[in-house]
Curated annotation (Swiss-Prot):
The gene is cof. Coiled coil: none annotated. InterPro entries: Cof, HAD-like_sf, HAD-SF_hydro_IIB, HAD_sf, HMP-PP_phosphatase. Disulfide bonds: none annotated. The keyword Cell inner membrane does not apply. Its cofactor is Mg(2+). Mg(2+) binds at D8, D10, D212. Its EC number is 3.6.1.-. The active site is at D8. This is HMP-PP phosphatase. It catalyses: 4-amino-2-methyl-5-(diphosphooxymethyl)pyrimidine + H2O = 4-amino-2-methyl-5-(phosphooxymethyl)pyrimidine + phosphate + H(+). One of its GO terms (molecular function) is 4-amino-5-hydroxymethyl-2-methylpyrimidine diphosphatase activity.
Length: 273
C-alpha cells in the first residue's frame, strides 16, 4: 500500500483552464480519508500554490519551484536550494542569442522585466502575479530558479548555449514546451520528494506520483509507482516507456485513475473505462 501521493499541477492535476476539477477534489479527499499523505510537486511558486490550495479547500506538503523549496502543511520551510550568485549574475549580464523573456523566482515572488498580462491567465485562482522590475537590480543571492519563455525551438537553441557556457554548474529542464528552467545542480522534483520522504520516515518506494513533463521525469522514474498523463510531452513517454499512461488532464485523468485504484487496486487499469 502506498502512503504518499505526489502530483504535478499544470498538465496533470489541473484542467486546461487551470482549475482542479470536482472529481479530482473528491478523489483527493478520499485519499486523505484513507490515510494517504498528499504532496503537490510543481514548478509553481509557493505563494501561488497556497492560493490554489486554499481556494480548493485541500492541503498537503508542497514541493515548489521544481524542487527548490519543500514546505510542510503549515508552510514551514523544510528544505531548499538556490542558484549560485555568480551564475545568476552571469546569466543576467550575458547577451544571449534569444528573444526569450526571463523570469526569476525568489521567496518574495516572481520577478520579470517582461510585461505580458497573458502570463497571468494560469494564476487566476490564486491571484499570483509577476512583479515588474529591472532584473539586474535584484539581489544575486536567494534566487531559486530562472525561467526562459519563448517558442520551443528558440528555447532548444538557448539551452545549448546555456549548457555550453555553464557546463554542469546548473541543471536545465522543460517544464512546458514553451518554458525552459535553470535550476540548482541536482535539484529536481525526484530529489526533493526523496528528502521529504526521509523527513516523513518513508522511502520513495512508498510513494506514487503523477506527471506530464520533463521536469517530472526524475520523480516518476524513482517512486514506487509512476503514472504518466495521456497528454504528456512525447519525450517523457519515450524516456519512461516502462510507466503506465493514464487519462488526460482535461478529462480529470488523475481522478479516473485514483477512483479505480481506491476501489479495485487488484484489477488492470485502462483509461478508456
Amino acid at each position: 500500500m502506498y502512503r504518499l501521493a505526489a502530483f504535478d499541477m499544470d498538465g496533470t492535476l489541473l484542467m486546461r483552464d487551470h482549475r482542479i476539477g470536482g472529481a479530482t477534489l473528491n478523489a483527493l479527499h478520499q485519499l486523505v480519508d484513507n490515510g494517504m499523505i498528499l504532496t503537490f510537486a510543481t514548478g509553481r511558486h509557493y505563494l501561488d500554490m497556497k492560493g490554489i490550495l486554499s481556494h480548493s479547500g485541500i492541503n498537503g506538503y508542497l514541493i515548489t519551484g521544481n524542487g527548490t523549496r519543500v514546505c510542510d502543511m503549515d508552510g514551514m520551510h523544510l528544505d531548499g536550494m538556490d542558484l549560485p550568485a555568480e551564475l545568476v549574475e552571469f546569466v543576467l549580464r550575458t547577451p544571449w542569442q534569444t528573444n526569450a523573456s526571463i523570469h526569476i523566482f525568489r521567496d518574495d515572488g516572481w520577478f520579470t522585466d517582461y510585461n505580458d498580462p497573458a502570463l497571468l491567465a494560469a494564476h487566476k485562482t490564486s491571484s499570483f502575479q509577476f512583479q515588474l522590475t529591472a532584473l539586474d537590480a535584484l539581489p544575486k543571492t536567494g534566487n531559486h530558479k530562472i525561467c526562459f519563455i519563448a517558442p520551443h525551438q528558440e528555447l532548444a537553441e538557448l539551452k545549448i548555449q546555456l549548457e555550453q557556457h555553464m557546463g554542469d554548474q546548473a541543471d536545465f529542464c522543460f517544464s512546458a514546451v514553451d518554458c525552459l528552467e535553470m535550476l540548482p545542480r541536482g535539484c529536481n522534483k525526484g530529489a526533493a520528494l526523496e528528502r521529504l520522504s526521509h523527513h516523513l520516515d518513508l522511502t520513495l518506494a512508498d510513494c506514487m506520483a503523477f506527471g506530464d513533463a520533463m521536469n517530472d521525469k526524475e520523480m516518476l522514474s524513482r517512486v514506487g509507482r509512476g503514472l504518466v498523463m495521456g497528454n504528456a510531452l512525447p519525450q517523457l513517454k519515450q524516456e519512461l516507456p516502462q510507466l503506465q499512461v493514464i487519462g488526460r488532464c482535461e478529462e480529470q485523468g488523475v481522478a479516473h485513475y485514483l477512483q479505480h485504484w481506491l476501489s479495485s487496486p487488484h484489477l488492470t487499469y485502462s483509461p478508456e473505462f
